[in-house]
């Protein structure tokens, strides 16, 4: 399945300004916080998790939380999509790929899960 999400970097900036680190901790793990170096990268992580949940066909909710979706970086700085053991088992995931981009005030992510 394929999931896509786009988010305004300005929207993420406003949420971060209003709620500070509480906003970030709502959807990012400690390791992911280290990847959140700019508002654009934070927006990319948000879009990535939303896209991954859509690729599962459920969205963010009871079946799949933000913390069931894990975003890492390869040595070449490419995004790596992983899931919690529960998600791998419940959705029988064999492979997952992710692309994130940001330009013109938006971040977009595409996730493919099979």
From Swiss-Prot:
It holds the Pfam family ACPS. Its main location: cytoplasm. Mg(2+) binds at residues 5, 50. The keyword Nucleotide-binding does not apply. SUPFAM superfamilies: 4'-phosphopantetheinyl transferase. One of its GO terms (cellular component) is cytoplasm. Its cofactor is Mg(2+). One of its GO terms (biological process) is fatty acid biosynthetic process. GO terms for molecular function: holo-[acyl-carrier-protein] synthase activity; magnesium ion binding. InterPro entries: 4-PPantetheinyl_Trfase_dom (IPR008278), 4-PPantetheinyl_Trfase_dom_sf (IPR037143), ACPS (IPR002582), Ppantetheine-prot_Trfase_dom (IPR004568). It is found in: Cytoplasm. Keywords: Cytoplasm, Fatty acid biosynthesis, Fatty acid metabolism, Lipid biosynthesis, Lipid metabolism, Magnesium, Metal-binding, Transferase. Disulfide bonds: none annotated. Its EC number is 2.7.8.7. It catalyses: apo-[ACP] + CoA = holo-[ACP] + adenosine 3',5'-bisphosphate + H(+). Belongs to the P-Pant transferase superfamily. AcpS family. Transfers the 4'-phosphopantetheine moiety from coenzyme A to a Ser of acyl-carrier-protein. This is Holo-[acyl-carrier-protein] synthase. It comes from Campylobacter curvus (strain 525.92).
């Amino acid at each position: 399945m394929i999931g896509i999400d786009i988010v305004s970097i300005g929207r993420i900036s406003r949420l971060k300004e209003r709620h500070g680190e509480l906003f970030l901790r709502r959807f990012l793990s400690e390791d992911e916080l280290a990847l959140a170096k700019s508002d654009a990268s934070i927006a990319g992580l948000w879009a990535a998790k939303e896209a991954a949940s859509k690729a599962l066909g459920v969205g963010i909710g009871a079946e799949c939380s933000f913390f069931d979706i894990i975003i890492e970086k390869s040595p070449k700085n490419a995004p790596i999509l992983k899931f919690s053991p529960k998600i791998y088992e419940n959705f029988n995931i064999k492979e997952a790929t992710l692309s994130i981009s940001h330009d013109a005030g938006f971040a977009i992510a595409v996730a493919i899960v099979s």
